[in-house]
Amino acid sequence: MEGGGGGADAQAQAQPVAQAPPAMQPMQQLSRYESQKRRDWNTFLQYLRNHRPPLTLARCSGAHVIEFLKYLDQFGKTKVHASGCAYYGQPSPPAPCPCPLRQAWGSLDALIGRLRAAYEESGHAPESNPFAARAVRIYLREVRDAQAKARGIPYEKKKRKRTQQQQPPPQPPLPPQHQPGAAAGEASSSSSAAAAAVAAEGSGSSAATAAATSQTGGGGGSTTTTTASAAAPTTATRV
């Protein structure tokens, strides 16, 4: 009996432990632009599959892209007045009219931009991009002008910033010693100081002359005193 129990324990240990299923990693959320671009690309591919006669992406041209844009007009929500409508050219008509709804020019322009990027991201050469064809650009320009006149909403072009002409950089200010005004001020100050010094020397020499004259006029005693005082340092030097 004990041996049978040991075999049961061995079988229990041999059974693999059931592992929990790995947690599903959350899918990376696409941005709003990327999601819209993917939807637009799938819509265009579906349009090519339903096209009669069948049309492949390699044979798609700018004319087919324009045909696709006209096909989308039936799903538009923008009122575009006809030339014979009484509200033609009025941005806010007072009453409804039987004019059809169309895709707004701004929506078509943004759509072409997304499809143009999606075409190149799918591995196709930019040179063969039908969404970048000149005919598509001309068609979008015509739609823009026609809707602007019909809706009475002028299209304002974005003003491009004009490249300012490169002007030479301003020269740095000269140091004080090189500035004409400062040099003139220093020159005038130096001249004034020199004139004051000359005047002081002149007054000193005049005073000395006056003193000498007064001593000379005082008689021989003063002369002897001056001579003695002058000779005194000589005697002291000899000692």
From Swiss-Prot:
Motif range (Nuclear localization signal): 157-161
Protein name: Protein G1-like8
Organism: Oryza sativa subsp. indica
Record has Transcription regulation as a keyword: yes
Keywords: Developmental protein, DNA-binding, Nucleus, Transcription, Transcription regulation
Domain of life of the native organism: Eukaryota
Annotated GO MF terms: DNA binding
Residue stretches of biased makeup (Pro residues): 167-178
Protein function: Probable transcription regulator that acts as a developmental regulator by promoting cell growth in response to light.
